[in-house]
Curated annotation (Swiss-Prot):
It comes from Hadronyche infensa. Belongs to the psalmotoxin-1 family. Double-knot toxin subfamily. This is Pi-hexatoxin-Hi1b. One of its GO terms (molecular function) is ion channel regulator activity. Keywords: Disulfide bond, Ion channel impairing toxin, Proton-gated sodium channel impairing toxin, Repeat, Secreted, Toxin.
Length: 75
């Protein structure tokens, strides 16, 4: 089962949000995966669709071929 990405519904799947996200019930709306405050993706963690979630000093690096993007040191 793939993890649920940021801002997508996590109704009935509260524990399936991707790393650094938590299921949050929005007022007048359904539950969605939202970023945990202060959380960031460390070096070499996958950052597809989460380009701004890499820790300070890292940037989301698109690897060649069909590989997923990862947080890598800013060169």
């Amino acid at each position: 089962n793939e993890c649920i990405r940021k801002w997508l519904s996590c109704v009935d799947r509260k524990n399936d949000c991707c790393e650094g996200l938590e299921c949050y019930k929005r007022r007048h709306s359904f539950e969605v995966c939202v970023p945990i405050p202060g959380f960031c993706l460390v070096k070499w963690k996958q950052c597809d669709g989460r380009e701004r979630d890499c820790c300070p000093g890292l940037e989301c690096w698109k690897r060649s071929g069909n590989k997923s993007s990862v947080c890598a040191p800013i060169t």
